């Protein structure tokens, strides 16, 4: 019986997407409650941001560690382990009375949340061959769906009961939605189907004559480069708009445009990857992102910035999933979780480094122009690695 791209594969994709939508909220919850914890603990905005910073550190490390776990124990046990970690973290967060304890708990919540990103992407990729690109893109979009769906649902709870009850709701959702759904993902792909997929991967990799280790390192460096570049507009667009005199509300709208464009781009690039392959799709996305960064330099009018932000969102959304697609196209399926998780960890580190670096450059120069140029240079590093891989394939 055919397993790749089967009806069961698509059913499994829907279940995995539901798991991702619930599981990834651990990354967004601290963003939702940030103003409330700042007020309750009487702290400044930078201190109130510490929980989010540690969430991202946990999320990055978790992608690497949970990737190895999924290779050894399967996705069901990995999701259950992550659900337990997050549930304990949510319940404990309801009891804290200072931001530092909350920050420590958010590190572990970020760690558990990671299982619903890289490892879930890797597991889903096993069940697709011809439609692997769009399947990976859909699962990777679970992170965006989570950020779009959950925050509006929490508004009434925040206003009536406070931020602690939000954690309580998440604990219940994790127990009663994530864990039951994970049991629907127990079935594993057959060894025969995996061998067929691995044979195709080996043929591709032999054509570029690169070891799995070297390819993973190159993709990791490329991931850091593209995400340092990507972080400049995403992390600093609100501050950039304030500097230009447009105010934070306009910056928030531009960020929303980027995220909406990112979802659309992610899906389009998934379809593109099924036609062209992951490497060429990555080249297209990286090149378009670089062009969008250049466009921020000459344009500072309100309408033009809205347009450029939309263009940026449409260019960058498909870049990160392309790394997972390349890994599955060129490397053994048995190592998919480990290698996808590691590269995803590097992309997240790139976002963190880039966000800090852009702020540091702004502090030195008093302008975001140099920060945009910094992002463009890092983007060129990413593009050069992709071109190297394409050249090796000729």
Predicted regions and their residues:
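Paired small-residue
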Residues: 89, 100-108, 292, 303-311
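Extracytoplasmic
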Residues: 11-45, 63-66, 150-151, 232-238
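Intracellular juxtamembrane helix-capping segments at the cytosolic ends
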Residues: 115-128, 318-331
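Helix-loop-helix hairpin linking two adjacent transmembrane segments in secondary transporters
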Residues: 139-190
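Conserved MFS/SLC helix-loop-helix module at the cytosolic interface between two early adjacent transmembrane helices
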Residues: 61-100
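Helix-to-loop junctions at the C-terminal end of transmembrane segments
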Residues: 62-74, 266-277, 363
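Extracytoplasmic gate region of multi-pass secondary transporters
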Residues: 30-37, 214-269
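Structural signature of the two symmetry-related core transmembrane helices
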Residues: 77-91, 280-295
């Amino acid at each position: 019986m055919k397993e790749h791209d089967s009806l069961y594969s698509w059913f499994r994709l829907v279940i995995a997407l539901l798991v991702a939508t619930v599981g990834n909220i651990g990354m967004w919850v601290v963003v939702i409650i940030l103003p409330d914890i700042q007020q309750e603990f009487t702290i400044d905005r930078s201190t109130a941001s510490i929980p989010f910073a540690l969430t991202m550190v946990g999320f990055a490390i978790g992608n690497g560690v949970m990737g190895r776990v999924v290779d050894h124990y399967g996705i069901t046990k990995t999701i259950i382990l992550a659900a337990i970690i997050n549930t304990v973290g949510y319940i404990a967060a309801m009891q804290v009375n200072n931001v530092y304890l909350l920050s420590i708990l958010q590190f572990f919540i970020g760690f558990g949340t990671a299982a619903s990103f890289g490892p879930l992407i890797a597991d889903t990729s096993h069940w697709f061959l011809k439609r692997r690109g769009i399947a990976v893109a859909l699962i990777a979009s679970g992170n965006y769906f989570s950020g779009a769906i959950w925050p509006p649902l929490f508004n009434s709870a925040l206003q009536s009961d406070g931020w602690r009850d939000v954690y309580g709701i998440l604990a219940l959702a994790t127990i009663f939605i994530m864990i039951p759904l994970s049991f629907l993902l127990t079935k594993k792909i057959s060894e025969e189907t995996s061998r067929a997929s691995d044979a195709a991967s080996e043929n591709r990799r032999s054509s570029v004559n690169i070891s799995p280790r070297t390819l993973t390192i190159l993709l990791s460096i490329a991931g850091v480069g593209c995400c340092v570049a990507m972080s400049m507009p995403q992390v600093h667009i609100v501050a950039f708009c304030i500097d230009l005199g447009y105010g934070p509300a306009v910056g928030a709208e531009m960020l929303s445009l980027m995220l909406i464009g990112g979802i659309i781009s992610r899906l389009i690039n998934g379809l593109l990857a099924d036609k062209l392959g992951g490497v060429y799709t990555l080249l297209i996305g990286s090149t378009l992102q670089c062009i969008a960064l250049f466009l921020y330099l000459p344009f500072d009018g309100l309408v033009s910035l809205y347009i450029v932000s939309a263009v940026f969102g449409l260019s960058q959304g498909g870049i990160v999933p392309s790394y997972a697609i390349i890994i599955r196209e060129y490397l053994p399926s048995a190592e998919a979780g480990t290698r996808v998780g590691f590269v995803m960890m590097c992309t997240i580190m790139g976002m963190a480094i880039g966000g800090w670096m852009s702020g540091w450059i702004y502090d030195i120069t008093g302008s975001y122009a140099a920060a945009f140029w910094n992002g463009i240079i890092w983007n060129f590093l990413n593009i050069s690695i992709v071109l190297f891989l394409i050249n090796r394939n000729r």
